[in-house]
Regions:
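Conserved acetyl-CoA binding element of GNAT-fold acetyltransferases
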Residues: 88-102, 154-157
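Conserved acetyl-CoA-binding loop-helix of GNAT-fold acetyltransferases
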Residues: 97-100, 106-119, 146
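Conserved GNAT acetyl-CoA-binding A-motif
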Residues: 122-132
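Conserved active-site alpha-helix within GNAT-family acetyltransferase domains
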Residues: 111, 115, 123, 135-153, ...
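Conserved GNAT-fold acetyl-CoA-binding loop/helix
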Residues: 27-50
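A short helix-loop-beta-strand connector motif used in the catalytic cores of GNAT acetyltransferases and
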Residues: 48-63, 94
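Conserved N-terminal entry element of GNAT/NAT acetyltransferase domains
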Residues: 1-17, 25
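Conserved beta-strand in the GNAT
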Residues: 63, 70-79, 94, 99
């Protein structure tokens, strides 16, 4: 995919059905990694929730679209104000979800979405960007490391 054939923009209500399709794709990746946690063929967000999220001031939903207007990927991010007695106060962006259609992965779509999110975070005065990646999702871990992300903390679990 050529970079000039791709546009990254804020999501619109008309994009929701395609976003839901892509949410199903990413859920199925997670379900393969952790069938004990994820149900097959479900989505993290339903269409009404995405519609509501589009109106929130602390939520950023980006889509990458091809020349024909087909949504090839999305990025959900939330803006947070970090405060605490022992924490440096700052604004932060948390990338909640990023998905590229399986048919066009490794073609620069994810990179373009991430670059736009970084630009957006800078314009909004964020000091950092955080995200979570499921253990075993080596493609995602490699992608984020190659784009400057490094471990900040570890979440450990003990199955009972």
């Amino acid at each position: 995919m050529e970079a000039e054939e791709l546009t990254v923009r804020f999501a619109k209500e008309a994009d929701i059905p395609r976003i839901v399709e892509l949410l199903r794709q990413v859920n199925n990746v997670h379900q393969q990694l952790r069938p004990d946690l994820f149900l097959p063929d479900h989505t993290k967000y339903a269409a009404p929730e995405i519609k509501r999220m589009l109106r929130l001031h602390d939520t950023v939903i980006l889509v990458a679209v091809d020349a024909q207007g087909l949504v090839l990927g999305y990025l959900f991010a939330f803006l947070k104000q970090i405060r605490g007695d022992n924490l440096v106060s700052r604004r932060s962006m948390h990338i909640d979800d990023l998905c590229v259609d399986a048919a066009v992965r490794h073609s620069g779509v994810g990179r373009r979405l991430l670059e736009q999110a970084v630009e957006c975070a800078g314009q909004l005065g964020c000091a950092d960007i955080t995200l979570n990646v499921w253990e075993g999702n080596e493609d995602a871990i490699s992608f984020y490391r190659n784009h400057g992300f490094a471990p900040k903390s570890h979440i450990l679990e003990m199955k009972l």
